[in-house]
């Protein structure tokens, strides 16, 4: 789980358009992965049953319960929390709830990693004061909106395999939302069509990430 280090900028215009229809996919299994970050740690738990509250520069209170979680924060530090699956898939992800930002930068996204190649990926559904996401590669239309596709390289940064150099693949929705269905397969196919290939999927979560501000979110995931 890596934060973006670039200065905050306005999203660039879309350069390429790819439209991929949704497909009927099997339902997902129950949640079996809880993600929290305190400074640079990646923490995995088989059962979503814990609370995070750290005060280095501020407060983050994270409370998962079954397939739902709440998070309240007021901090200058980075945090990332999420709920999902130990192994990602192309199955659709349903999410519903709230995402309110008083100040600072925050993202509500589908978030995960792949290995071989090592890739960190985001499907950003809502955001506040978003940073630059790298280089615009194209776009994809899915779930009632266009998404700008970005690619970014991280050099000697923390990852799920330790300090490494890896790419980030990022889809950013043009009409933000706090609830809906994300057809993950559409994004994976659009990335692949642009030469942005994923490897073996590692964990995959609905994540709230924030830094330098305050806000609150409540989400249910399936």
UniProtKB/Swiss-Prot annotation:
GO cellular component: extracellular region
Single GO biological process annotation from the record: xylan catabolic process
Pathway: Glycan degradation; xylan degradation
Keyword Signal: yes
Enzyme Commission designation: 3.2.1.8
Pfam families: Glyco_hydro_11
Function: Endo-1,4-beta-xylanase involved in the hydrolysis of xylan, a major structural heterogeneous polysaccharide found in plant biomass representing the second most abundant polysaccharide in the biosphere, after cellulose. May act as an elicitor of plant defense responses in certain plants but does not exhibit any cell death when transiently expressed in N.benthamiana.
PANTHER family: ENDO-1,4-BETA-XYLANASE, ENDO-1,4-BETA-XYLANASE A-RELATED
Listed name of the protein: Ethylene-inducing xylanase 2
């Amino acid at each position: 789980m890596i934060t973006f280090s670039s200065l905050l900028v306005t999203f660039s215009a879309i350069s390429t358009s790819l439209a991929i229809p949704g497909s009927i996919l099997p339902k997902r299994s129950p949640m079996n992965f809880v993600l929290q970050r305190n400074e640079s740690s990646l923490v995995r738990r088989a059962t979503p049953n814990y609370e995070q509250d750290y005060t280095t520069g501020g407060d983050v209170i994270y409370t998962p319960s079954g397939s739902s979680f709440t998070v309240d924060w007021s901090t200058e530090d980075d945090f990332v929390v999420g709920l999902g699956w130990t192994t990602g898939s192309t199955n659709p992800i349903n999410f519903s709830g709230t995402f309110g930002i008083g100040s600072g930068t925050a993202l509500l996204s589908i978030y995960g990693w792949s290995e071989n190649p090592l890739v960190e990926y985001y499907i950003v559904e809502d955001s506040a004061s978003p940073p630059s996401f790298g280089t615009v590669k194209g776009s994809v239309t899915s779930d009632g909106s266009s998404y700008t596709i970005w690619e970014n390289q991280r050099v000697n940064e923390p990852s799920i395999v330790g300090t490494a150099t890896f790419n980030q693949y990022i889809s950013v929705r043009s009409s933000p939302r706090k609830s809906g269905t994300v057809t993950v397969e559409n994004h994976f196919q659009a990335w692949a069509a642009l030469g942005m290939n994923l490897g073996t999927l590692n964990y995959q979560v609905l994540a709230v990430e924030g830094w330098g501000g305050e806000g609150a979110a409540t989400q249910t995931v399936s």
